[in-house]
Each structure stands twice: as C-alpha cells, then as structure tokens.
C-alpha cells in the first residue's frame, strides 16, 4: 500500500510542478486500482502512470452504469425482470467496449493469475488470492437437530456431537475464487477512490480544516514518527475529517439493503416476506432530525460520535453484513490523505468554483470531476 501511495505522490508532484489544475478523481482511481491489485492479487501494474491502461478502462466501463438508466430502473422496479435486465445491461456495456465484455476481460485476467499460482509453486505470495486458493469450505453431510439436546442427557449430547463432526471440507472451486476475487477487485477500487475525491474537494473548499489537519500531521512527524499503518490510526482529527466527508458524501447509496425474512407490520406499513428494503443512506446522512446543520462540513461533530453507534451513519453499512473491507479502506484513505496533505496544499481549480456535479451510479454517488490545483509545501514549514 505504501509503495502505491509513493507512486501517487510522484504523479502529484509532476502535476504541482506544472502549476495547472487537473482532475484528481482519476488519480485516486488509479491509486486504488494499484493498491487492490498488489495487496489482493500480488500483481504489479503500471496503472498509475499509464494513461492507456486497459485494466482501468475496463473497470471504469463497468461502473459507467447509471441508477436512472432505463434498463436498470426496470430491473429494480420489477424483480421478475431483473435477470433479463442485467443481461441486457451487460450487452450494452459490451457494445460500448467494442464487442469486448469488460467483465469477461477482468475475470480472464484473474483466472490467468490463479492458473499460474497453481502450476508454479514459486509464484505463491502472501496475499488474499493465495488465502482463497489455500482455503477450504466446510460442508454438512447431515442435518443436525439442536432440539435433541437436553440438560444432563449425555447420550443425546454424543449423538449431536457425532452429527457435528459428520462434516467434510473441500477446496474453493476456481469459479468461486474468480467470482470472489472479481468482487474484491471492484469493491476495492471504486468506493475508496470516490471517498478520497470527495475529501480532497472538501479540504480544498475549507482551508481552515486543511490547516488543522496539516498541524496534526506535522506534530506527529516532529515526534519522530512516520506516516504509516501504526501511526495514522492515532490521528484523531484525520479520522474526524474522513468520517464527516463520508457523511456529507457517502460513496455508496444502495449498499445497505435487506430482504424481509417474514411478514412485518411496521406501524401502518405492511412489509411482506421477501420484500427488498433499502436504506436511503444519503438522505439519512442529511436528515436534520439526526444531524445538526447537516449541510455544513464540520469534522468536530464526530468528537463525541453521537450518531455513529446507531443506524443513522451508514457509509459502510451496518450489522454482521457490513462492508468486509471497511478497515482496509479506512487505512488506505488515511494514508493517502495524510501523505497528500503533508506534501501539498490542495486548492480548488477554476473549473471547480461551482458545486460538485454528482453522478448517481448503480451503487455509488460519484463526482463527475474534481478539479484542483496543488502547491508543494516548503519542507521547513
């Protein structure tokens, strides 16, 4: 992760030396793609400095789908048509990619790495992909009836114990690994880069917050510590800045959803079994009932964290099915922002004087562009 961030800093240094404004969302997209391919799959890419990266182009195309696209809207409104609409949407994306399905291209690349790992023992690496290749799935060969248990009945306990041990394990299939790796690739790329772009915009717009964050970073460095895993998690103001950024601009707006497991009567509303319930994350993050002056960017509102223990703050979902990569994403975002602010002062570009133009994608709320200028900081300040 650190090596990828240092490459990003080189890219930003070149931009700062030119003195021109540029679109930073693309820079962060390249960073997160580089990080996820290295850490999850052990793949070295040139995506950060290669303007014609086929990997990035294919991934961007997958996320091009808008929430209000007719095909997607119909699929969401009519569950019985969802599979048909999904296939139609894949066809549309394939046509936009000159007949090459980007999903297939990415899966083929992952499959190639898997086959290399299996055929060449020396190719093994300490990463997520290798963990999946070495892992096994436990499956039941019988059903266990917990109701058999009675206090003090040792015969029944032995019977149930026999059923518990009557299991077998199998390795994950290649198809399962490819599907899981594909999901990790996409999840690790889009959401974190979106959060970073929004944070850069807010820091450029609120120079006082940027100055406070720089002061916290400088104090850490003056104590002889480096910006790394063990230290960025000890920067409370940085944590507040990122938390407030994701409150105002939650990257994911349709992540927290659940199917009703049974019929529920919620006040005057009847929720039948099987109905999909989606939490309006952006709306909840801007509800004045939960947040005082919700449209104001104020990192200090997270000093006491009054709302984060409930279900009014959902950038990573909630409950046992929340985002599995939450800690990874938070660490990546903290390192990227801390290093960037330490090296550069972020200012809004002329193209970004107006409010952000936000695109409502299928799962994410992404900025159409975040134009900024960078000024290199004096090493002695």
Regions found by a protein language model. Name each.
Residues 1-194:
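Cytochrome P450 heme-thiolate monooxygenase catalytic core
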Residues 22, 97-99, 119-123, 186, ...:
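Conserved, non-catalytic sequence blocks in retroelement Pol enzymes and Pol-derived host proteins
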Residues 42-47, 53, 190-215, 271-274:
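Classical protein tyrosine phosphatase
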Residues 108, 112, 227-267, 288, ...:
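Conserved cytochrome P450 K-helix E-x-x-R motif and the immediately C-terminal K′/meander segment
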Residues 182, 187, 267, 303-333, ...:
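Cytochrome P450 heme-thiolate "Cys pocket" and heme-binding signature region
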Residues 207-210, 326-364:
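Cytochrome P450 heme-binding "Cys pocket" and the immediately downstream C-terminal segment
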Residues 279-306:
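Conserved cytochrome P450 K-helix/beta-meander segment immediately N-terminal to the heme-binding cysteine loop
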